[in-house]
Amino acid sequence: MGTASSLVNPGEVIEDTYGGGGGEACVIPVEVKPKARLLRSSFRRGPRVIGASFKSTASVDLEYAAEYERLKKEYEIFRVSKNNEIASMQKKEVKLDEENKRLRAELQALQKTYQKILREKESAVEAKYQAMERAATFEHDRDKVKRQFKIFRETKEKEIQDLLRAKRDLEAKLQRLQAQGIQVFDPGESDSDDNGTELTVPGTQCEYWTSGGLGSEPSIGSMMQLQQSFRGPEFAHSSIDVEGPFANVNRDDWDAAVASLLQVTPLFSQSLWSNTVRCYLMYTAETQAEVKIFLKEYSPKLQRMCETSGYFFQVTFFPEECENQYFAVRKWEIEKSSIVILFICSSLPSCLQEDCEEAFLKNTEAKPCLIYHRIEDGRSDSEGLKQLLEQDTNKANKTKIVDHYGDPVEGANKIYCQLEQVINQDLLGIEITDPNAKDDSATKEEDDFWDVLWDVHDEQEQMEAFQQASHSICELGFQKYYDRLNDLVAAPAPIPPLLISGGPGSGKSLLLSKWIQLQQKHSPNTLMLYHFVGRPLSSSSEPSLMIKRLFLKLMQHSWSVSSLSLDPAKFLEEFPHWLEKLSIRYQGNIIIIIDSIDHIQQSEKHMKWLIDPLPVNVRVIVSVNVETCPQAWRLWPTLHLDPLNSKDVKSLINMECGRANIILTKEQERKLERHCRSATTCNALYVTLIAKLLTWAGSTGNIDDVLQLCLQCQDTVSLYRLALHSVQEVMPSAKDKEFMREILCFISASRNGVSECELMELCPGLTWPVLTSLIFHLYTLVLLKYSCGLIQFQHLQEILSFNILNFKAWDAVNLEYMQGDQSIISEYREKLIQHFNAQLSCDRVTWRSADELTWLYQQQGEKQKLHRCLMNLFVSQNLYKRGHFAELLSYWQLVGKDKISMASEYFDALKQYERSCEGEEKMTSLADLYETLGRFLKDLGLLSQAVTPLQRSLEIRETALDPDHPSVAQSLHQLAGVYVQSKKFGNAEQLYKQALEISENAYGSEHMRVARELDALAVLYQKQNKFEQAEQLRKKSLKIRQKSARRKGSMYGFALLRRRALQLEELTLGKDTSDNARTLNELGVLYYLQNNLETAETFLKRSLEMRERVLGADHPDCAQSINNLAALYNEKKQYDKAEELYERALDIRRRALSPDHPSLAYTVKHLAVLYKRKGKLDKAVPLYELAVEIRQKSFGPKHPSVATALVNLAVLYCQMKKQAEASPLYERAMKIYEDSLGRMHPRVGETLKNLAVLRYEEGDFEKAAELYKRAMEIKETETSVLGAKAHSGHSSSGGDTYSVQNALPVCAFPE
């Protein structure tokens, strides 16, 4: 039996085939253990089915056995895999243990190595510190020894110089004795040679040099002192003396004409020296319409025009109701004015008669004047007007009358056009030739000093400071101080600077300015370089600007080309080396005077070069306040200014009162004498201020009251406060007094002062009568002064409590109006910021806004606004182009930007600005900005970054203007300069040649731009050791510069010459006198120096005619005019006329002058050169021989000038094929050069070259090669000494020796 349950799986549903309900199969438990053997079924049919038995289907053992086998297999597989994993992990563990052991060993080794290196580092650091200490000690000892050796060397050189001078004096005495017929012993016949001392001075006459390695050069001061200070025509003070228009004119003539122009001269009125074009305007009621139109429409245009040239422009006028008031003020304004304008119709009111008489009839300085005369039908001019027009036209001859009939608008336009022409031509000195020719103006300033940037306003400020400091006519017993200063100049070198000390207001500036005037008068060969330091934190107290200005003043006396660094640190460091280099090129003393040197920012740090020994011909004088003098400077020789004694006090007060026609009573004098006995009341400024207050009060008649108030003031500040109260009392209204307070506060809050036109804009409601009256009173009481067109306070004082330097007047204003409250100062500075920001918003970027706005932001601590201001490209361009490089860097450092950040931000700003540029004018401005950025980056040392903006500037100019435009040459020149500094000489040479070609095509072959390119190419060839090519270019450049009719660095240039010529022309309108004839001659020379040859010829002819009438035809003065006329014709290449006049002048001077007179020598020289130029060699020979005789009589037979004359004569003989006669002359000249200048002097080398050519022509090739080789050795020696610089453009003949440099055939001598 069995069941069918084993045939189905558990849980399956079993269907009922009989229709019944199905059920689920389940496992029926077996309760009875089955038997081991079952009975076979008796009814089984068919074959047996496997597993169909009950045993096979229901057996548990079979089921579990299968499952067991399966699990067993799985377990076995699992076990084997896990065993494998365990074995693998064990292997990895073993491997990791081994790696761990290895790493631990390495770690221990590294730790040991680290400890070893750490110990070595500590020992190395300790050794480094010890080495640094030893180096510092060694450097200190080296500097000490170096300084001692320099002192020793300079002392010995001075002794040598004194011995040489004594030797020359003895030779001169010997020659005089021989001339008198006294037989004396001739040292030349003795066995001993008194000229045996060899003085080797390589390169002392070299004019051209660049900034080579300063550290490797010998002391140029010593080189200069070893050279004898020979006098002679070829030993000129500068290359301007050698040839060209200056050489053709007698040196005495042009020295007299030019010397006063190169120094500060008081011949010009304050208005011409001021930085303001002042128009004094007068009008009547009938012409008010024209005046209103002129002031509204045309005055702003003139203001923009003057701002472009760096000048202020203002129109001062008094309304008709004020004409009867302010008489003294109106007279003062007329005196200050640059031009007077009168608007008038048919009558002249009585209220204007005094002003017209003062402006037109008493116009002693010949100022330009304009009269607008409106003509109306049916009205005739009054008698007073007719008389004014007739008198002024006949006498002054400087008044232009504009007659107008018709519309007032047209009349105002006429007077505007006339005024514009007068301002440009007569006041600013701008020649108007082509209205469209404005391209050259952008770089005019840079041409004056090649690539050196400078600020014309800084120079003008110094000149005005000198004038104001020397204004006093009372010298207060300065003679004893003058003697001490003179002793300093005459003392043997080396000596430290002289310290002039004294209290504030003791007269230090006055003493220095008066002594400078005396030196200029009595020692014209002494170069005076002065700097007056003004208000602290002003431009004048910036050390880098001061040093650069002094350097440029030195450069006026040397035609050198310099690559001057604008980096302030390098500039201040290299200045002593530049001073040594330049001192040798000036044959005379150089005196540097710095007033108030203690006011310079970080003076002790930046003036360290004063401690080192100075070059032998350099003297330094500085003034300081006693309280603020640095301790290291107190060891210098000191000249202390004592307080005034009672005599000086009385003299000063009486002099000031006498000028105002005021006489003090005896009682008043006694009161003053008793009062002025203490140190503060005997101060020069204190006494001057008392005198000013008394004279100012004298007009009101209350001297006793003012004197009593003055006696209550015990110091200068209290006196200034009294002066402020006195001026306030005369102001007519409370509103005017408020204006006074605001004006003084604006001046106090500004950096360099405020101009009058700026005050009119800053103070709404302020009128010209009130402003001019206030300034007049404050100026009279020495509270205010003018400086470069700005109103400033006078006199400095140190306020120790604030540790800042201030004006005494500023201190008084601070106490009176601000009570030391910084918030009030900040308030007025904010008003100034708003004013200058308004100018920037109108695209008016002037030197004033660039200077003041950046400084005001710095003082206010507004860094973000300062940064925005610096990002104004035109503000930064203005600062950079005026040389304020150090100031610009300091501002960027203040806002936290480095050089790379600056460059990046400027690039981004330029790119943004370029997107808005359209039109030629905008593109030209963009090119200028790119060029400025390139130059700025070059000065920062970022040469690779500088190339991109310069290339962009070049592209813009070539596209917007023309590839041959002169400004393209400017871009090429600047880009080449960057390549030179980057040592890419091939690229630089190509660019320089392109710039040269463009400049020659645009300006001609004798323009200063051409000379600049030639100089740049010469420097480039010098760096490449192409010395012959470099020297050729330098000589060519030198000739161009000599022919240029201006002196480099003269601040006013032709404008000064033109104004001086106009003044002289006014002086020659009188009778025939010798003085007028001399003035005419001087006037002709001045026009000649301007290359205005036609006008010069007219005046020289007038001078000659007047001298012949007054003095006679054979007078030496007539020979002077004839000689100058001959020089003029020589310059015009009219050689026949020049020859005739030279012969006539020579005849007169031979009969009238001594045989060795310098004027005779000049005429002989120029006539001989003219003969040689015309090929009349036979006529030239006796003149050259005469030149030798004259120089022998003047300087002695062994003077270099004699050798030069011998060389000239020898060259002439060579040209005449008389080599036999030339040879001994060359040998004699070479012997003189070797004995006097040294065997390695360039003059010896030039003579050897000439002699080599002579031997070559004679066929003695071996001797010629020997001489030429020695000449080249001298040249190489000179080049190595001067840092690879070429020889001077001065030829050995002083300009008229035949050049043999290229006369030798190619391959004449082996290399």
Swiss-Prot record:
This protein's name: Nephrocystin-3
One of the protein's GO biological processes: Wnt signaling pathway
Cellular location(s): Cell projection, Cilium
Pfam families in UniProt: NPHP3, NPHP3_hel, NPHP3_N, TPR_12, TPR_7, TPR_NPHP3
Lineage: Eukaryota, Metazoa, Chordata, Craniata, Vertebrata
Keywords assigned: Cell projection, Cilium, Coiled coil, Repeat, TPR repeat, Wnt signaling pathway
Coiled coil segments of this chain: 81-183
TPR repeat start and end residues: 889-923, 927-960, 969-1002, 1011-1044, 1077-1110, 1119-1152, 1161-1194, 1203-1236, 1245-1278
Cystine pairings recorded for this chain: none
Signal peptide stretch: none
Gene Ontology CC terms, in alphabetical order: cilium
Function of the molecule: Required for normal ciliary development and function. Inhibits disheveled-1-induced canonical Wnt-signaling activity and may also play a role in the control of non-canonical Wnt signaling that regulates planar cell polarity. Probably acts as a molecular switch between different Wnt signaling pathways. Required for proper convergent extension cell movements.
